[in-house]
Amino acid sequence: MQTVTDPVEMQTISEKLRLGRQLIGVVMTMGALHEGHISLVKLAREQAGTVILTIFVNPTQFGPNEDFHRYPRPFEQDAALARSAGVDYLFAPEAGAIYPEGFSTAISCSGVSDLLEGEKRPGHFSGVATVVTKLLNITRPHLAVFGEKDAQQLAVIRRVVTDLNIPVKVVAAPTMRESNGLAVSSRNIYLTAGQRESAGAIWRSLQHALDRLAAGETGLKELAEATATMIASESGFRVDYVAFVDEETFMPAERALKGRSYRILAAVFAGGIRLIDNACFASPTHIAGEEA
């Protein structure tokens, strides 16, 4: 595995790989690697001959009162994990290399980025869209793998790639989970043992919502409210939001229609730690009580 810190050097390497007809896959991370990240690397490895992993704690996607300065940065451990996972190139630039003096460009993506995480974390998705676009331009991959845990981020990236005609295939990878259903996340290290156990209620509650949809419920707004109540009751955590969106448009949805797919998303505070998760439901072609 070769570690690269200079964007120009990384671009040069990728250009040579492309000239050699090597299929390039990229996995973008902020470090603090865990088994979820490794699963993304494995998926990239299945589809590409060369895998690039990026580690960059992006300052522009953190709000003023968020955890940028204390976000874990165990670089040596991350590098060892990346090497053992079969990563070919580790791209780990400093902030000044990505945002040099005079940098003044930002990408905004209206619509999908305006609700939920976008509403709760102003400027977050602009930071995400900008750094992802830069990293795509630097690594020049044929495909980029992102986890479904950050479902809204995935939707934003897909929108940006489509709107800006970026020639890359966006691949979604399923969420890795701990034994109690808690979505694997770098921020889970902040949780106490008790919080970690209680956090299993998030996934149980989302699954319960999908079960109710499968049983014929169609009122998504009411079901989201009931799910928020269940999460709070079973975990003792403060719920930031629970909401349904249409899977195709990622716009808010209040009633399930036949033949449509919906995603329920939740954000929860376990003490001062913010956890997010989601689950997808594919509606049958007929829903009880709905006219054909």
Swiss-Prot record:
Read off the InterPro entries from this record: Cyt_trans-like (IPR004821), Pantoate_ligase (IPR003721), Pantoate_ligase_C (IPR042176), Rossmann-like_a/b/a_fold (IPR014729)
As recorded in UniProt, its EC number(s) are: 6.3.2.1
Query: Does the keyword field hold ATP-binding?
Result: yes
The biological process GO terms on file are: pantothenate biosynthetic process
Task: Reply yes or no: does the keyword Nucleotide-binding apply.
Answer: yes
Residues binding ATP:
30-37, 147-150, 184-187
Q: Tell me the CDD domains matching this sequence.
A: PanC
Q: Which cysteines are joined by disulfide bonds?
A: none
* GO cellular component terms, semicolon-separated: cytosol
| Molecular function GO labels | ATP binding; pantoate-beta-alanine ligase activity
Signal peptide residues are none
Q: Which domain of life is it from?
A: Bacteria
Q: Which reaction does it catalyse?
A: (R)-pantoate + beta-alanine + ATP = (R)-pantothenate + AMP + diphosphate + H(+)
Q: In which pathway does it act?
A: Cofactor biosynthesis; (R)-pantothenate biosynthesis; (R)-pantothenate from (R)-pantoate and beta-alanine: step 1/1
Keywords for the protein's UniProt record, in alphabetical order: ATP-binding, Cytoplasm, Ligase, Nucleotide-binding, Pantothenate biosynthesis
The entry marks the following residues as binding beta-alanine, namely 61
EC class of the enzyme, as a word: ligase
Q: Where in the cell is it found?
A: Cytoplasm
Protein residues bound to (R)-pantoate: 61, 153
Where does the record place the catalytic residues? 37
UniProt record similarity statement: Belongs to the pantothenate synthetase family.
Instruction: Recite the other comments.
Output: The reaction proceeds by a bi uni uni bi ping pong mechanism.
Quaternary structure, from the entry: Homodimer.
Primary role: Catalyzes the condensation of pantoate with beta-alanine in an ATP-dependent reaction via a pantoyl-adenylate intermediate.
Q: What is this protein called?
A: Pantothenate synthetase
